[in-house]
Amino acid sequence: MGRLHCTEDPVPEAVGGDMQQLNQLGAQQFSALTEVLFHFLTEPKEVERFLAQLSEFATTNQISLGSLRSIVKSLLLVPNGALKKSLTAKQVQADFITLGLSEEKATYFSEKWKQNAPTLARWAIGQTLMINQLIDMEWKFGVTSGSSELEKVGSIFLQLKLVVKKGNQTENVYIELTLPQFYSFLHEMERVRTSMECFC
């Protein structure tokens, strides 16, 4: 197997077999499954709806739900990696072909990827920003009055208190910085703000 764009990790053994099963699906079946998959990728919180759609697809196409879940897990390998690495539709297509999916189906999936890429990118950025949402920040300046290291006496330091939202809870994070570290941190925060304004 060739090198993949979406991951450097070894690919699970089941993936090759799952791709062969996907190749056996008719064009209409593959199209319907891809539609279900992109609904899930663009609205990942709708897990129950996704599982219900998979169950319905399995029943309609007389495929066991267990094998369909394995197929979908293998199929999600590329888009999940592609989101993390911002891959192009061509790279997504190449990865599916490398994994053993037929060129026709890989092309169809990559076209769908191209159509949904802006929505998926916005969602991925939103997820990244929601991991630890900064709610509030306070800082206090201080001067070192006593230290075992003579040159540190009289140096200015800064204590930061960050209020971070983790899930449904808030947590206080305390950081102590030297003045140069603080200015570097401030500079990075300005860069983040500028980047964020580009997306709004």
Curated annotation (Swiss-Prot):
Listed Pfam families: COMM_domain (PF07258), COMM_HN (PF21672)
Task: Name its GO BP terms in alphabetical order.
Answer: negative regulation of DNA-templated transcription; negative regulation of NF-kappaB transcription factor activity; tumor necrosis factor-mediated signaling pathway
Keywords (A to Z) from UniProt: Cytoplasmic vesicle, Transcription, Transcription regulation, Ubl conjugation pathway
- InterPro entries in the cross-refs: COMM (IPR017920), COMMD4/6/7/8 (IPR047155), COMMD7 (IPR037358)
Gene Ontology cellular component terms for the protein in this record = cytoplasmic vesicle
Q: Tell me a Gene Ontology molecular-function term this record carries.
A: NF-kappaB binding
Q: Which PANTHER family match?
A: COMM DOMAIN-CONTAINING PROTEIN 4-8 FAMILY MEMBER, COMM DOMAIN-CONTAINING PROTEIN 7
Assembly and oligomerization: Component of the commander complex consisting of the CCC subcomplex and the retriever subcomplex. Component of the CCC (COMMD/CCDC22/CCDC93) subcomplex consisting of COMMD1, COMMD2, COMMD3, COMMD4, COMMD5, COMMD6, COMMD7, COMMD8, COMMD9, COMMD10, CCDC22 and CCDC93; within the complex forms a heterodimer with COMMD9. Interacts with RELA. Interacts with CCDC22, CCDC93, SCNN1B, CUL7.
- This protein is called COMM domain-containing protein 7
Q: Which organism is it from?
A: Homo sapiens (Human)
Taxonomic placement: Eukaryota, Metazoa, Chordata, Craniata, Vertebrata
Gene (UniProt): COMMD7
